[in-house]
């Protein structure tokens, strides 16, 4: 995955819009890979999460991956505001179909380290694709897009989602 220089500097917060109650994206769409956009099936797009994605099925897509629970509009807005306030740590992407319905998602969480000259490490998490949309390489495109974001915000290393799954299974095998 990403092999950015060891002297990583976080992207200034001004490159990521804060929603302030509007439907602005969670971060700048300039961080979306043009190559990934071009590789999506016709009619699909990938973009940063927006506040209005609650109504577009964001949580329903996450339910393919894990338990989400019942989340009210108010709870969604509180969590969205909290994530948005950490404007150089959280990068959540969604894939939308022609109807602007969310069919896939993934997250990049940026961790600050003391090592590697106060470097940044990216963690790709929560890759989920709606069951009826699987088989279109949308999960792969989400991972590629998040890796591109990680590289562009200065991460010297990225831990991919799939590797975590493999390692956790191997770890369980060793521990049993």
Question: Over which residues does each language-model region extend?
Answer:
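Helix-loop element at the rim of GNAT/NAT acetyltransferase active sites that forms part
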Residues: 52, 60-73, 114
């Amino acid at each position: 995955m990403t092999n950015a220089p060891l002297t990583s500097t976080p992207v200034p917060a001004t490159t990521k819009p804060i929603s302030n109650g509007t439907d602005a994206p969670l971060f700048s769409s300039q961080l979306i890979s043009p190559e990934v956009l071009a590789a999506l099936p016709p009619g699909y797009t990938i973009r940063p999460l927006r506040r209005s994605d609650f109504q577009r099925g964001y949580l329903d897509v996450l339910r393919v991956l894990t338990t989400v629970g019942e989340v009210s509009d108010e709870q969604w807005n509180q969590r969205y505001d909290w994530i948005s306030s950490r404007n150089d740590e959280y990068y959540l992407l969604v894939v939308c179909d022609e109807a602007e319905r969310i069919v896939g998602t993934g997250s990049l969480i940026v961790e600050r380290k003391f090592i590697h000259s106060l470097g940044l490490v990216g963690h790709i998490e929560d890759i989920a694709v709606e069951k009826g949309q699987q088989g279109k390489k949308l999960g792969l495109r989400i991972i590629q897009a998040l890796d591109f974001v990680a590289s562009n915000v200065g991460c010297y290393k990225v831990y991919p989602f799939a590797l975590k799954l493999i390692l956790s299974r191997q770890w369980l095998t060793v521990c049993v």
